[in-house]
Amino acid sequence: MKEKLMRCIIERILKEYKEGKTLDKKRIEQIKSECLRIYRIGIGHPSNSEILKYATEEEKKILIPILRKKPVRTISGVAVVAVMTSPAKCPHGKCIFCPGGLDSVFGDVPQSYTGREPATMRGLMFNFDPYLQTRARIEQLEKVGHPTDKIELIIMGGTFPAREIEYQDWFIKRCLDAMNERESKSLEEAQKINETAKHRCVALCIETRPDYCSEKEINQMLKLGATRVELGVQSIYNEILKLCKRGHSVEDTIKATQLLKDSGLKVSYHLMPGMPGSSIEMDKKMFKEIFTNPDFMPDMVKIYPCLVIEGTELYEMWKRGEFKPYREEEAIEVISYAKSIMPKWVRTSRIQRDIPATVIVDGVKKSNLGELVYKYMEKKGLRCRCIRCREVGHVYYKKGILPDPEHIKLVREDYEASGGTEIFLSFEDVKNDILIAFLRLRDPYKPFRKEIDDKTMLVRQLHVFGWEKALTRDIKEVSWQHMGYGRMLMKEAERIAKEEFGKKKILVTSGIGVREYYRKLGYKRVGAYMGKEL
């Protein structure tokens, strides 16, 4: 009887699809109800992943994009897999706002987490085993119809470079083993296998503190295969950093930013408006400084308003009436301002932490703060031109607009940052302001890596957006990843490096699983990079 129910749902969806009817979430649920009334089985609405089990391979090609949950998960062309390291002490002590850690009110959980976040719960469930966490997340994404051939691996759980080198190597190796679906003898072997694996690690992100980002830590991160480093900057005011016991200075942030960029890595800042000692005006000034002062200018930002959580020093201050976090409308005002002045080469990767409202004592409890910011900006006539707001998948998802091929042009923006010259190359629909692909090219300032000399130009990032989505009538590919934009951007980067900067060599910081792509463009391994003589 259950099989008949599932076939009923599948056949009705396919029939309406062929008739060109709208198949949104509401209509899918109605179809489930209609079939349940026919077969009168005493179960609730079957999940989409359960329905897919009863579909043929041909049917799945149509059903998966229609039933796919949370399309934003792979809207940028890659599937994100976040893996949590085991709980360990923070290298510098504890910030006043930081929950979690060993012996916290939440038990032994990773530093700065509560144990209630999805990634932390997955970590706890698998005893922080990197292999099991990675496998479980990939399987979870596949069940709800997401492609998992391109994986962005994010290592969460505190200052990863502060852990023992042996732990770091083992942890990344086990994540790669899970993607490779086989055991390897060493990190190097796991990386080599992953270059052509079914689930390729196309990006690896590591979180650290500005004072744990010296040449030594950067060398280790590059050895692991890192392509992006997220810095816990929080504030650029030393008095606030000191008050909050951050244990690092703004000078550490400036130095770490320069070293990372000159090593070809992407730089993401974690920023926390509303910290003790700050104000709305100070936070607005901070964002303006970060986006205009060449000492900073990160490639990406995550914005988390300061929250009061039990078990922290900040909680005790709050109880004594010494601190009051931002109200929702204050946080929206500050973040909207930040987004309205954000340069087109910055990407907003997250607004608001993944902490459940139940553990937030005071502060912004809405998990959809980003949506509220978006609505506020629309109402005020403000516009954000960051990468995320302009990328092809997000524009289609939010506005239903696709790029017009006649208006797709190569666009270039040069700017000075961290002592060097940055060139942001992109293919854009200039009429509709839609971003299709981009490349970050850098003439470094003071590189320390032996592979990089004064005749070397760096490609810090190449990204072509891709996404599939079921449209009302047809399954259309909103995917730009196989139209040659990547090759054209690389060709232009090589031309600029040779003709305009007189360079003899170009190096690319390539994800492990993208090395084969660069080999096809004539690149070969040069230390931690893929390189080519010009």
Curated annotation (Swiss-Prot):
Disulfide bonds, paired cysteine numbers: 384-389
| Single GO MF descriptor | S-adenosyl-L-methionine binding
Residues that hold [4Fe-4S] cluster according to the record: 90, 95, 98
Q: Name one Pfam family in it.
A: ELP3_N
Q: What is the effect of changing residue 150 to A?
A: Strongly reduced tRNA acetyl-coA hydrolase activity
Instruction: Give start and end of each Radical SAM core domain.
Output: 73-344
Q: Which UniProt keywords apply?
A: 4Fe-4S, Acyltransferase, Disulfide bond, Iron, Iron-sulfur, Metal-binding, RNA-binding, S-adenosyl-L-methionine, Transferase, tRNA processing, tRNA-binding
Q: Which GO terms describe its biological process?
A: tRNA acetylation; tRNA wobble base 5-methoxycarbonylmethyl-2-thiouridinylation; tRNA wobble uridine modification
The free-text function statement in the UniProt record for this protein reads: tRNA uridine(34) acetyltransferase, which mediates formation of carboxymethyluridine in the wobble base at position 34 in tRNAs. The proposed mechanism is the following: (i) recruits S-adenosyl-L-methionine and cleaves it to generate a 5'-deoxyadenosine radical (5'-dA) in the radical S-adenosyl-L-methionine (rSAM) region, (ii) hydrolyzes acetyl-CoA in the N-acetyltransferase domain and (iii) an acetyl radical is formed by the products of the two domains and (iv) is transferred onto the C5 position of uridine(34) in the bound tRNA molecule.
The similarity comment for this entry is:
Belongs to the ELP3 family.
Q: What is this protein called?
A: tRNA uridine(34) acetyltransferase
Give the species: Methanocaldococcus infernus (strain DSM 11812 / JCM 15783 / ME)
